[in-house]
Amino acid sequence: LLDIYNRQEQYDKVIATLNRIEGKMGKSEQLSMEKFRIYLQMKDNKNAFHEIESLVAEYPMDTRYQVVLGDVYMQNGKKDEAYGIYRKVLDAEPDNAMAMYSLASYYEATGQKELYQRQLDTLLLNKKVPSETKMNVMRQFVVQNEQDGRDSTRVISLFDRILEQEP
């Protein structure tokens, strides 16, 4: 039923169905994330915020939701709130790759290029960040570097420094 409504872009019915399921089964991460996704598709930022904020309240120790909330704030021009969340997460978990990347994106979006580069280095040169995560970030960095028409020297230098650390 959810798939049918979703394919037909009847998002109000998707939300109503998810709310009925939630009423019967109780609140869950999966349902809240699905409602969040649908609200974003509907461009209903108020309810999208509410869903993520409720997940943060429900699972206060799970920093993923805090970072997602920060990302939603960034996408909606609430940069100070986003920055505060990223700093809070990194103060509690300095090696949180998701928060490191989001903070780097914050610096880039706010025109703080030097801090962006430094934060990206912090993420990519952190031995506790999984190699797969580093590869994904590097892919994005390479694409962005090419789109911006920048010299590839920085990319090569960063690759060399990462490879020195990785077996």
What residue ranges belong to the model's regions?
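Alpha-solenoid helical repeat scaffolds
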Residues: L1-P167
